[in-house]
């Protein structure tokens, strides 16, 4: 199993390009199931979750062709097996995103209940409830969601909670439904908007993406299109935090601050200077960061996927910060590992109180989920001596070539097998 070795104490500087967003790419790849025409995607990140999704789509009969460095052409003309088996799904919860498109196009789907991250329960009941409202017959048996419908009917759906994958699944299904579907309490995330833009380029009729009410007028069929995946805002935020923690000066290319307002604001509160360009962001960090408190909540509030990284920078900041997690239970698994490096953190329910210390010291730590592992990398970059991070397959699920990108910015980091 791969490990990451980090020699701490190097200041990050220079330029590096960001990748396409995993959380936009996964649903957008599933959108190819809605048409028999080829769909061309660019700026697709090279990540384990993407490879898993492409294997899953291939198993269903979708033609997968690589095109250049970051391009993929998917052809759903040969779609003949609307099944997502446990073997394919167990490592990645996003595989539930095939459910809506399959029912809409094939009239049937069997999708194993998903695996993926270890950060608490993520029920698919909102997806099921929405499909039932659209006339699908849905059963959950032997660990599979089995859905059937001759043709889905437009419906008014109000989800019990804000769910990103639920919104995406139902929006895709509604594209081929008969009549109008209205999704209320819809997720407003930029990745939902990117998916909607892709679907519209394929001939879908969607309005309101990016607000909490999305309207979809069903059409008889969708066609091929070309779509560039949006930049990864969480990867961007993670590198900004890494530079901030090390007192660095970096410029991130092929990205946008448009969806990062809360993250940028918090980094400025911590004392960083940030310059936003059209397709780039520059951060200049102070000698020592100031502690910043935060509360996670659905977009456009502070993203839960940046919580662990901000905990890491607060570990060595001046002052005391309170971090309140309101999205997922069980999302403080990085705390014990950060404490092995010398952090001073106290958990009280869904709050973490972080008291900044003067220095962290390298140790062996274990990654427990994708964003937790990113926080350990940031802490390792500032810790004195060597930090060894075990189980970095979690990192590979969401960060493309992280050791190469960090090394380009001057970090002493290498992967060992």
Swiss-Prot record:
Pfam families: EPSP_synthase
Domain of life where this protein originates: Bacteria
Bilayer-crossing regions: none
UniProt-annotated binding residues for UDP-N-acetyl-alpha-D-glucosamine: 93, 122-126, 305, 327
Location within or outside the cell: Cytoplasm
Primary location class: cytoplasm
UniProt modified residues of type 2-(S-cysteinyl)pyruvic acid O-phosphothioketal: 117
Active site: 117 (proton donor)
UniProt: phosphoenolpyruvate binding residues: 22-23
Pathway(s) this gene product operates in, as recorded in its UniProt entry: Cell wall biogenesis; peptidoglycan biosynthesis
GO annotation, cellular component aspect: cytoplasm
Top EC class for this record: transferase
Alphabetized SUPFAM superfamilies for the sequence: EPT/RTPC-like
Keyword Transferase: yes
Catalysed reactions, semicolon-separated: phosphoenolpyruvate + UDP-N-acetyl-alpha-D-glucosamine = UDP-N-acetyl-3-O-(1-carboxyvinyl)-alpha-D-glucosamine + phosphate
NCBIfam families per record: murA, PRK09369.1
Record-stated family: Belongs to the EPSP synthase family. MurA subfamily.
Name assigned to this protein: UDP-N-acetylglucosamine 1-carboxyvinyltransferase
Provenance organism: Dechloromonas aromatica (strain RCB)
Gene of this entry: murA
